Regions:
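A short loop-to-beta-strand structural motif that recurs across blades of beta-propeller domains
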Residues: 29-32, 77-81, 121-123, 164-166
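Conserved blade-ending motifs and adjacent loop-strand segments that build the rim/top face
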Residues: 49-50, 93-103, 132-151
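Conserved Ser/Thr-centered positions that define the repeating blades of beta-propeller domains
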Residues: 1, 33-34, 82-83, 89, ...
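Blade-level signature of beta-propeller repeat domains, shared across WD40, Kelch, NHL, RCC1
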Residues: 142-173
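Glycan-association/targeting regions that enable binding to alpha-glucans and other polysaccharides
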Residues: 173-219
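Structural signature of eukaryotic scaffold interfaces centered on beta-propeller domains
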Residues: 10-17, 55-60, 104-109, 148-151
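Residue-level signature of beta-propeller blades and closely related beta-rich strand-turn architectures
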Residues: 28, 71-72, 120, 162, ...
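Short, solvent-exposed loop/turn segments at conserved positions within beta-propeller repeat blades
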Residues: 24, 72-76
């Protein structure tokens, strides 16, 4: 339990560019913190009174948040987006059917592609589009419980209900092989690395094309 909701925190997300900005939810309530969790502001007053299943920040904009709902009802209230950290919300359910949405991730592309793990399959659209597209290449007809963007291999990975883990190429990205090797300058020991000492990470990939930009995420 916790004093924020009087119950368990069921979902949490941390902004990509500022780890002091985070969002947490319990059932239908959503709160935002900008001081690393010391204080929270509730931002769910205008959101549906339904169970929140997931939260995601836009990796390019910490003010943009998407929340998903796990309801079966014919209410067109499955996905909501805020561009001002919850001060106001926009319903972006659009053409999705009457099914629960289990998971949401946002890719670090120019268009900020949104992926949804749904009761049946995966759906995607860019941040600016108004239509969701089924993204189900070779995926079994099953519930997608969790999604994750795997930057090292340019793939979207999803866990399903009883049908294993599946992986497929991200949209809007040029394919390239996975990272071949990664090493750091000082291998961790009981005494290393010392605080304040820089660590250098070297990764090797095999690629024949020209790279205009490279995005690196340290997890």
């Amino acid at each position: 339990g916790n004093s924020f909701f009087g119950g368990n925190i069921q979902n949490a997300a941390i902004a990509e560019n500022n780890s002091n900005t985070l969002a947490i939810s319990n059932y239908n309530r959503l709160k935002i913190s900008n001081d690393g969790g010391l204080t929270f502001t509730e931002v769910s007053q205008s959101l549906p009174n339904q169970f929140i299943t997931d939260i995601a920040f836009d990796p390019k904009d910490d003010d943009t948040i998407i929340v998903t709902y796990g309801t079966y009802g014919n209410n067109s209230q499955k996905v909501y987006m805020s561009s001002n950290q919850g001060s106001s919300w926009q319903n972006i359910t659009h053409n999705l059917g009457n099914m629960p949405i289990r998971s949401v991730v946002i890719d670090h592309t120019d268009d900020s592609t949104i992926y949804l793990g749904a009761e049946i399959g995966v759906y995607k659209k860019s941040m600016s589009e108004n239509t969701w597209e089924l993204y189900n290449e070779n995926l079994p007809n099953t519930t997608v419980m969790e999604l994750e963007v795997v930057y090292g291999s340019n793939t979207l990975r999803g866990t399903t209900w009883g049908r294993g883990v599946w992986e497929y190429s991200l949209t809007g990205r040029e394919n390239f092989p996975s990272i071949l090797t990664t090493r750091i300058s000082n291998q961790p020991t009981d005494t290393q690395p010392k605080e304040g000492i820089d660590q250098f990470v070297t990764s090797m990939i095999e690629y024949d094309g020209d790279l205009n930009s490279v995005y690196v995420e340290w997890i």
